[in-house]
Protein backbone atom coordinates (compact mmCIF):
# COMPACT_ATOMS: atom_id res chain seq x y z
CA UNK A 1 0.00 0.00 0.00
CA UNK A 2 1.22 3.50 -0.79
CA UNK A 3 0.96 4.78 2.79
CA UNK A 4 2.72 1.80 4.37
CA UNK A 5 4.73 2.87 7.42
CA UNK A 6 8.00 0.90 7.59
CA UNK A 7 9.63 0.13 10.91
CA UNK A 8 12.74 1.97 9.67
CA UNK A 9 13.69 4.38 6.90
CA UNK A 10 17.01 6.17 6.27
CA UNK A 11 17.08 9.95 6.70
CA UNK A 12 18.65 11.12 3.44
CA UNK A 13 18.75 14.64 2.04
CA UNK A 14 20.58 17.16 -0.09
CA UNK A 15 23.82 16.73 1.87
CA UNK A 16 24.11 13.06 0.95
CA UNK A 17 23.33 13.78 -2.72
CA UNK A 18 25.98 16.51 -2.80
CA UNK A 19 28.51 14.19 -1.15
CA UNK A 20 27.94 11.51 -3.78
CA UNK A 21 28.24 14.07 -6.60
CA UNK A 22 31.54 15.30 -5.19
CA UNK A 23 32.96 11.78 -5.29
CA UNK A 24 31.62 11.09 -8.78
CA UNK A 25 33.07 14.35 -10.05
CA UNK A 26 36.46 13.56 -8.48
CA UNK A 27 37.03 10.51 -10.66
CA UNK A 28 38.03 8.39 -7.64
CA UNK A 29 34.99 6.40 -6.51
CA UNK A 30 36.50 3.42 -4.71
CA UNK A 31 38.44 3.44 -1.42
CA UNK A 32 40.30 6.72 -1.13
CA UNK A 33 40.30 10.13 0.57
CA UNK A 34 36.69 9.95 1.78
CA UNK A 35 37.54 6.76 3.67
CA UNK A 36 40.38 8.59 5.36
CA UNK A 37 38.08 11.48 6.27
CA UNK A 38 35.46 9.07 7.63
CA UNK A 39 37.99 7.20 9.73
CA UNK A 40 39.36 10.43 11.20
CA UNK A 41 35.87 11.77 11.92
CA UNK A 42 34.81 8.55 13.62
CA UNK A 43 37.91 8.61 15.81
CA UNK A 44 36.89 12.10 16.91
CA UNK A 45 33.45 10.73 17.81
CA UNK A 46 34.62 7.73 19.82
CA UNK A 47 37.96 8.99 21.11
CA UNK A 48 39.94 6.13 19.57
CA UNK A 49 43.31 6.47 17.89
CA UNK A 50 42.53 4.29 14.86
CA UNK A 51 39.51 3.46 12.74
CA UNK A 52 39.28 1.10 9.78
CA UNK A 53 36.31 1.46 7.42
CA UNK A 54 34.98 -1.78 5.94
CA UNK A 55 32.22 -2.96 3.62
CA UNK A 56 30.01 -4.13 6.52
CA UNK A 57 30.11 -4.72 10.25
CA UNK A 58 30.09 -8.44 9.46
CA UNK A 59 33.29 -7.95 7.46
CA UNK A 60 34.72 -6.01 10.40
CA UNK A 61 33.88 -8.85 12.79
CA UNK A 62 35.42 -11.40 10.44
CA UNK A 63 38.78 -9.66 10.13
CA UNK A 64 38.84 -8.65 13.81
CA UNK A 65 38.52 -12.30 14.81
CA UNK A 66 41.16 -13.21 12.22
CA UNK A 67 43.50 -10.52 13.53
CA UNK A 68 43.18 -12.09 16.99
CA UNK A 69 44.19 -15.44 15.51
CA UNK A 70 40.85 -17.10 16.30
CA UNK A 71 40.68 -20.57 14.77
CA UNK A 72 40.25 -24.30 15.22
CA UNK A 73 39.80 -25.36 18.84
CA UNK A 74 39.11 -21.85 20.12
CA UNK A 75 35.93 -20.66 21.83
CA UNK A 76 34.32 -17.23 21.56
CA UNK A 77 31.67 -16.10 24.05
CA UNK A 78 28.71 -14.19 22.64
CA UNK A 79 25.03 -13.84 23.45
CA UNK A 80 22.61 -15.85 21.34
CA UNK A 81 20.40 -12.74 21.29
CA UNK A 82 22.25 -11.14 18.41
CA UNK A 83 22.32 -11.09 14.64
CA UNK A 84 23.64 -14.41 13.35
CA UNK A 85 26.57 -12.89 11.45
CA UNK A 86 28.74 -12.93 14.57
CA UNK A 87 28.09 -16.63 15.11
CA UNK A 88 28.64 -17.33 11.42
CA UNK A 89 32.04 -15.65 11.41
CA UNK A 90 33.16 -17.61 14.47
CA UNK A 91 32.10 -20.89 12.88
CA UNK A 92 33.63 -20.07 9.49
CA UNK A 93 36.99 -19.57 11.22
CA UNK A 94 36.74 -23.06 12.70
CA UNK A 95 36.08 -21.87 16.25
CA UNK A 96 33.14 -22.64 18.53
CA UNK A 97 30.59 -20.00 19.53
CA UNK A 98 29.73 -20.26 23.21
CA UNK A 99 26.27 -18.71 23.42
CA UNK A 100 25.21 -17.26 26.76
CA UNK A 101 21.98 -15.92 28.21
CA UNK A 102 21.05 -12.26 28.68
CA UNK A 103 19.28 -10.19 31.29
CA UNK A 104 15.55 -10.81 30.89
CA UNK A 105 14.57 -7.13 30.95
CA UNK A 106 17.42 -5.31 29.17
CA UNK A 107 18.53 -8.14 26.83
CA UNK A 108 22.13 -7.30 27.74
CA UNK A 109 24.70 -10.03 28.25
CA UNK A 110 25.73 -10.09 31.91
CA UNK A 111 29.21 -10.53 33.42
CA UNK A 112 27.87 -13.45 35.46
CA UNK A 113 26.80 -15.34 32.35
CA UNK A 114 30.10 -14.55 30.64
CA UNK A 115 32.27 -15.67 33.55
CA UNK A 116 30.38 -18.95 33.89
CA UNK A 117 31.18 -19.72 30.24
CA UNK A 118 34.94 -19.03 30.36
CA UNK A 119 37.21 -22.03 29.76
CA UNK A 120 40.92 -22.41 28.90
CA UNK A 121 39.82 -22.38 25.23
CA UNK A 122 38.11 -18.98 25.45
CA UNK A 123 39.91 -16.59 23.11
CA UNK A 124 37.46 -13.65 22.87
CA UNK A 125 34.39 -12.12 24.50
CA UNK A 126 31.88 -10.29 22.28
CA UNK A 127 29.31 -8.26 24.25
CA UNK A 128 26.45 -6.69 22.27
CA UNK A 129 25.28 -3.12 22.88
CA UNK A 130 21.67 -3.99 22.27
CA UNK A 131 19.13 -1.70 20.58
CA UNK A 132 21.25 1.40 21.26
CA UNK A 133 21.95 0.91 24.98
CA UNK A 134 25.40 -0.04 26.34
CA UNK A 135 26.39 -3.27 28.03
CA UNK A 136 28.09 -3.10 31.45
CA UNK A 137 31.60 -2.47 30.16
CA UNK A 138 33.36 -1.99 33.50
CA UNK A 139 32.42 -5.48 34.62
CA UNK A 140 33.02 -7.08 31.21
CA UNK A 141 36.45 -5.52 30.71
CA UNK A 142 37.37 -6.50 34.26
CA UNK A 143 36.66 -10.11 33.32
CA UNK A 144 38.75 -9.78 30.18
CA UNK A 145 41.68 -8.40 32.16
CA UNK A 146 41.35 -11.00 34.93
CA UNK A 147 41.37 -13.93 32.52
CA UNK A 148 43.56 -12.40 29.80
CA UNK A 149 40.82 -12.55 27.16
CA UNK A 150 40.33 -9.85 24.49
CA UNK A 151 36.98 -8.04 24.34
CA UNK A 152 35.49 -7.04 20.98
CA UNK A 153 32.41 -4.85 21.38
CA UNK A 154 29.57 -5.46 18.94
CA UNK A 155 28.51 -1.83 18.53
CA UNK A 156 26.37 -2.28 15.42
CA UNK A 157 23.46 -0.62 17.28
CA UNK A 158 25.55 1.92 19.16
CA UNK A 159 26.61 4.89 17.04
CA UNK A 160 26.01 7.73 19.48
CA UNK A 161 25.81 5.49 22.56
CA UNK A 162 27.91 6.30 25.61
CA UNK A 163 28.75 4.43 28.81
CA UNK A 164 29.64 6.44 31.92
CA UNK A 165 30.56 9.51 29.91
CA UNK A 166 32.59 7.83 27.16
CA UNK A 167 31.43 6.90 23.67
CA UNK A 168 31.22 3.20 22.96
CA UNK A 169 34.55 2.01 21.58
CA UNK A 170 36.68 4.30 23.71
CA UNK A 171 37.61 1.41 26.01
CA UNK A 172 39.25 -0.72 23.31
CA UNK A 173 37.99 -2.35 20.12
CA UNK A 174 34.44 -1.98 18.78
CA UNK A 175 32.65 -2.63 15.50
CA UNK A 176 29.94 -0.28 14.20
CA UNK A 177 27.45 -0.77 11.37
CA UNK A 178 26.31 1.61 8.62
CA UNK A 179 23.60 -0.74 7.33
CA UNK A 180 20.47 0.82 5.85
CA UNK A 181 18.44 0.73 9.09
CA UNK A 182 21.20 1.93 11.42
CA UNK A 183 21.40 5.35 13.12
CA UNK A 184 23.70 6.54 10.36
CA UNK A 185 23.91 4.68 7.07
CA UNK A 186 25.63 4.53 3.72
CA UNK A 187 23.44 1.63 2.53
CA UNK A 188 26.08 -0.94 3.51
CA UNK A 189 29.25 -0.39 5.48
CA UNK A 190 30.91 -0.52 8.85
CA UNK A 191 33.92 0.64 10.82
CA UNK A 192 36.24 -0.88 13.43
CA UNK A 193 37.81 1.36 16.09
CA UNK A 194 40.82 0.47 18.21
CA UNK A 195 43.76 1.98 20.07
CA UNK A 196 46.14 -0.83 19.08
CA UNK A 197 48.30 0.19 16.09
CA UNK A 198 49.40 -3.37 15.27
CA UNK A 199 45.79 -4.56 15.35
CA UNK A 200 44.73 -1.68 13.08
CA UNK A 201 47.50 -2.55 10.61
CA UNK A 202 46.33 -6.18 10.52
CA UNK A 203 42.76 -5.05 9.85
CA UNK A 204 43.85 -2.80 6.99
CA UNK A 205 45.79 -5.62 5.38
CA UNK A 206 43.09 -8.27 5.88
CA UNK A 207 40.34 -6.04 4.45
CA UNK A 208 42.28 -5.55 1.19
CA UNK A 209 43.59 -8.87 -0.12
CA UNK A 210 46.27 -9.12 2.56
CA UNK A 211 48.25 -6.32 0.92
CA UNK A 212 50.27 -3.86 2.93
CA UNK A 213 48.69 -0.85 1.14
CA UNK A 214 45.56 -0.15 -0.88
CA UNK A 215 45.21 1.44 -4.32
CA UNK A 216 44.84 4.98 -2.94
CA UNK A 217 48.00 4.57 -0.84
CA UNK A 218 49.91 3.49 -3.93
CA UNK A 219 48.60 6.40 -6.00
CA UNK A 220 48.84 9.22 -3.47
CA UNK A 221 51.17 8.19 -0.69
CA UNK A 222 54.49 7.93 -2.44
CA UNK A 223 54.40 4.14 -2.03
CA UNK A 224 55.87 1.65 -4.50
CA UNK A 225 53.40 0.88 -7.30
CA UNK A 226 53.60 -2.85 -6.55
CA UNK A 227 52.41 -4.16 -3.18
CA UNK A 228 53.01 -7.60 -1.69
CA UNK A 229 50.59 -9.94 0.03
CA UNK A 230 51.52 -10.19 3.70
CA UNK A 231 48.91 -12.90 4.40
CA UNK A 232 45.78 -14.03 2.52
CA UNK A 233 43.05 -11.43 2.93
CA UNK A 234 39.62 -10.42 1.71
CA UNK A 235 37.95 -7.72 -0.39
CA UNK A 236 36.20 -5.86 2.42
CA UNK A 237 37.13 -2.26 1.57
CA UNK A 238 34.48 0.49 1.55
CA UNK A 239 34.05 2.55 -1.65
CA UNK A 240 34.39 6.31 -1.31
CA UNK A 241 30.83 6.67 -2.64
CA UNK A 242 29.63 4.96 0.54
CA UNK A 243 32.14 6.70 2.78
CA UNK A 244 30.98 10.10 1.55
CA UNK A 245 27.37 9.28 2.45
CA UNK A 246 28.46 8.05 5.89
CA UNK A 247 30.38 11.29 6.45
CA UNK A 248 27.32 13.38 5.59
CA UNK A 249 25.23 11.25 7.95
CA UNK A 250 27.81 11.49 10.73
CA UNK A 251 27.54 15.28 10.67
CA UNK A 252 23.81 14.88 11.41
CA UNK A 253 24.21 12.22 14.11
CA UNK A 254 23.30 14.38 17.10
CA UNK A 255 20.13 15.66 15.46
CA UNK A 256 19.13 12.22 14.14
CA UNK A 257 19.60 10.58 17.53
CA UNK A 258 17.81 13.42 19.34
CA UNK A 259 14.76 12.79 17.17
CA UNK A 260 14.98 9.06 17.88
CA UNK A 261 15.14 9.78 21.62
CA UNK A 262 12.10 12.05 21.42
CA UNK A 263 10.05 9.36 19.68
CA UNK A 264 11.22 6.75 22.19
CA UNK A 265 10.09 9.01 25.05
CA UNK A 266 6.66 9.30 23.43
CA UNK A 267 6.49 5.53 23.11
CA UNK A 268 7.35 5.05 26.77
CA UNK A 269 4.63 7.46 27.79
CA UNK A 270 2.07 5.75 25.55
CA UNK A 271 2.98 2.27 26.79
CA UNK A 272 1.78 3.15 30.29
CA UNK A 273 -1.77 2.61 29.01
CA UNK A 274 -1.00 -0.54 27.00
CA UNK A 275 -0.19 -4.14 27.98
CA UNK A 276 2.97 -4.34 25.86
CA UNK A 277 6.26 -4.28 27.81
CA UNK A 278 9.17 -2.13 26.59
CA UNK A 279 12.71 -3.16 27.42
CA UNK A 280 14.08 -1.85 30.70
CA UNK A 281 16.93 0.65 30.62
CA UNK A 282 20.36 -0.24 32.04
CA UNK A 283 20.95 1.01 35.58
CA UNK A 284 24.42 2.43 34.85
CA UNK A 285 25.02 5.94 33.53
CA UNK A 286 24.58 6.01 29.77
CA UNK A 287 23.31 7.79 26.68
CA UNK A 288 20.95 5.63 24.63
CA UNK A 289 21.14 5.88 20.82
CA UNK A 290 17.63 4.43 20.40
CA UNK A 291 18.46 2.32 17.40
CA UNK A 292 15.36 0.25 18.13
CA UNK A 293 12.24 0.56 20.26
CA UNK A 294 11.30 -2.95 21.31
CA UNK A 295 8.23 -4.23 23.10
CA UNK A 296 7.54 -7.70 24.48
CA UNK A 297 4.19 -9.21 23.55
CA UNK A 298 3.30 -11.82 26.18
CA UNK A 299 0.09 -13.62 25.25
CA UNK A 300 -0.93 -14.14 28.89
CA UNK A 301 -0.71 -10.38 29.47
CA UNK A 302 -1.71 -9.05 26.04
CA UNK A 303 -4.24 -11.66 24.84
CA UNK A 304 -2.37 -11.89 21.54
CA UNK A 305 0.85 -13.49 20.37
CA UNK A 306 3.77 -11.50 19.00
CA UNK A 307 3.36 -12.98 15.53
CA UNK A 308 -0.36 -12.20 15.50
CA UNK A 309 0.34 -8.63 16.61
CA UNK A 310 2.87 -8.14 13.82
CA UNK A 311 0.44 -9.57 11.27
CA UNK A 312 -2.37 -7.33 12.52
CA UNK A 313 -0.18 -4.22 12.35
CA UNK A 314 0.79 -5.15 8.81
CA UNK A 315 -2.87 -5.25 7.76
CA UNK A 316 -3.11 -1.70 9.13
CA UNK A 317 -0.17 -0.59 6.99
CA UNK A 318 2.41 -0.59 9.78
CA UNK A 319 5.73 -2.41 9.54
CA UNK A 320 7.55 -4.06 12.42
CA UNK A 321 10.81 -5.93 12.95
CA UNK A 322 12.11 -8.88 14.94
CA UNK A 323 15.51 -8.23 16.55
CA UNK A 324 16.29 -11.04 16.93
CA UNK A 325 15.25 -14.63 16.65
CA UNK A 326 17.83 -16.14 18.99
CA UNK A 327 20.73 -17.66 17.08
CA UNK A 328 20.65 -20.98 18.95
CA UNK A 329 17.01 -21.54 17.91
CA UNK A 330 17.83 -21.35 14.18
CA UNK A 331 18.27 -24.54 12.17
CA UNK A 332 22.05 -24.70 11.80
CA UNK A 333 22.79 -23.84 15.43
CA UNK A 334 19.81 -25.74 16.80
CA UNK A 335 21.14 -28.93 15.20
CA UNK A 336 24.68 -28.37 16.47
CA UNK A 337 23.75 -27.30 19.99
CA UNK A 338 20.63 -29.43 20.63
CA UNK A 339 20.86 -29.35 24.43
CA UNK A 340 21.51 -25.62 24.81
CA UNK A 341 18.82 -23.78 26.76
CA UNK A 342 18.92 -20.06 27.50
CA UNK A 343 15.66 -19.31 29.33
CA UNK A 344 15.62 -15.51 29.30
CA UNK A 345 16.86 -15.33 25.72
CA UNK A 346 14.19 -17.80 24.60
CA UNK A 347 11.40 -16.03 26.49
CA UNK A 348 12.26 -12.76 24.79
CA UNK A 349 12.94 -14.25 21.37
CA UNK A 350 9.35 -15.48 21.27
CA UNK A 351 7.89 -12.11 22.32
CA UNK A 352 10.02 -9.19 21.07
CA UNK A 353 8.76 -6.82 18.38
CA UNK A 354 10.46 -3.68 17.05
CA UNK A 355 8.04 -0.79 16.45
CA UNK A 356 8.59 1.92 13.81
CA UNK A 357 11.37 4.29 14.87
CA UNK A 358 13.30 6.56 12.51
CA UNK A 359 14.18 10.28 12.45
CA UNK A 360 11.77 11.25 9.66
CA UNK A 361 8.83 9.65 11.46
CA UNK A 362 6.08 12.24 11.89
CA UNK A 363 3.65 12.83 14.75
CA UNK A 364 0.95 11.45 12.46
CA UNK A 365 3.02 8.30 11.93
CA UNK A 366 3.44 7.89 15.67
CA UNK A 367 -0.27 8.39 16.29
CA UNK A 368 -1.05 5.68 13.71
CA UNK A 369 1.08 3.18 15.59
CA UNK A 370 -0.40 3.97 19.00
CA UNK A 371 -3.97 4.00 17.69
CA UNK A 372 -3.40 0.61 16.07
CA UNK A 373 -1.93 -0.83 19.27
CA UNK A 374 -4.94 0.37 21.26
CA UNK A 375 -7.28 -1.20 18.70
CA UNK A 376 -5.43 -4.51 18.83
CA UNK A 377 -5.40 -4.44 22.64
CA UNK A 378 -9.16 -3.94 22.60
CA UNK A 379 -9.03 -0.48 24.15
Swiss-Prot record:
Keyword Cell membrane: no
Protein name: UDP-4-amino-4-deoxy-L-arabinose--oxoglutarate aminotransferase
Reaction catalysed by this enzyme: UDP-4-amino-4-deoxy-beta-L-arabinose + 2-oxoglutarate = UDP-beta-L-threo-pentopyranos-4-ulose + L-glutamate
Name of the gene: arnB
The entry's keywords: Aminotransferase, Antibiotic resistance, Lipid A biosynthesis, Lipid biosynthesis, Lipid metabolism, Lipopolysaccharide biosynthesis, Pyridoxal phosphate, Transferase
Subunit details: Homodimer.
UniProt xrefs under InterPro entries: ArnB_NH2Trfase (IPR022850), DegT/StrS_aminotransferase (IPR000653), PyrdxlP-dep_Trfase (IPR015424), PyrdxlP-dep_Trfase_major (IPR015421), PyrdxlP-dep_Trfase_small (IPR015422)
GO molecular function terms attached to this record: pyridoxal phosphate binding; UDP-4-amino-4-deoxy-L-arabinose aminotransferase
Cellular component, GO, one term: membrane
Recorded metabolic or biological pathway in which this protein acts: Nucleotide-sugar biosynthesis; UDP-4-deoxy-4-formamido-beta-L-arabinose biosynthesis; UDP-4-deoxy-4-formamido-beta-L-arabinose from UDP-alpha-D-glucuronate: step 2/3; Bacterial outer membrane biogenesis; lipopolysaccharide biosynthesis
Cofactor needs: pyridoxal 5'-phosphate
Organism name: Salmonella gallinarum (strain 287/91 / NCTC 13346)
Origin: domain of life: Bacteria
Gene3D superfamilies xrefs: Aspartate Aminotransferase, domain 1 (3.90.1150.10), Type I PLP-dependent aspartate aminotransferase-like (Major domain) (3.40.640.10)
Segments forming a coiled coil: none
Organism placement in taxonomy: Bacteria, Pseudomonadati, Pseudomonadota, Gammaproteobacteria, Enterobacterales
NCBIfam families reported for this sequence: PRK11658.1
Enzyme Commission number(s) from the entry: 2.6.1.87
